[in-house]
């Protein structure tokens, strides 16, 4: 098994992340959309790479004041079941001590992702009805509180 490092998102990761997006999501981000995040001062994106520089996955988060909103967590099919998604979430949270909370939406039927987020300290806080399309599905809204007393 290859050694995985979590590194800042960079221009050389864009095309591989776009490929992962196409493999994982029914409404994937484009390369242009991902490239715009490189210059977005409100974006916190991290990339998981192996020792050969292959992109294994990524996480993207946007911040507004002291709030974080995870846009996507994705792991390439060839790298799944190795704890990479968990490492990405944990590293993002570790780098977010300046935030009061981080929140995300997850398909209500995505039990593995819900278990991952729960294991990383997220708790369900609501539902967004018909949030997803292709297929239409509710989203479970989950939040991790990073500062005491803000629940």
Model regions and ranges:
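Extreme N-terminal starter segment of soluble prokaryotic enzymes
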Residues: 3-6
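Acetyl-CoA-dependent GNAT
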Residues: 8-80, 86-95, 145-150
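Structural motif
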Residues: 20, 99, 119-120
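Residue-level recognition of the GNAT/N-acetyltransferase active site
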Residues: 76, 80, 107-109, 134
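Short glycine/proline-centered loop/turn elements that form peptide/ligand docking sites
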Residues: 89, 110-113, 130-135
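Conserved GNAT acetyl-CoA-binding A-motif
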Residues: 96-106
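Conserved catalytic-core motifs of GNAT/GCN5-like acyltransferases
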Residues: 103-105, 123-140
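Conserved active-site tyrosine of GNAT-family acetyltransferases
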Residues: 117, 122, 142
């Amino acid at each position: 098994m290859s050694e995985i490092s979590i590194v800042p998102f960079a221009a050389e990761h864009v095309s591989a992340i776009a490929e992962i997006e196409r493999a994982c999501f029914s409404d994937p981000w484009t390369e242009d959309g991902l490239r715009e995040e490189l210059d977005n001062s409100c974006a916190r994106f991290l990339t998981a790479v192996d020792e050969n520089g292959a992109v294994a996955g990524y996480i993207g988060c946007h911040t507004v004041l002291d709030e974080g909103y995870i846009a996507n967590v994705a792991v390439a099919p060839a790298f799944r079941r190795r704890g990479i998604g968990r490492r990405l979430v944990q590293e993002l949270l570790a780098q977010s001590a300046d935030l009061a909370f981080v929140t995300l939406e997850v398909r209500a039927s995505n039990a593995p992702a819900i278990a991952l987020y729960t294991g990383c300290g997220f708790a369900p806080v609501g539902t967004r009805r018909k949030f997803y399309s292709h297929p239409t599905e509710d989203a479970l809204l989950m939040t991790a509180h990073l500062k005491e007393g803000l629940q």
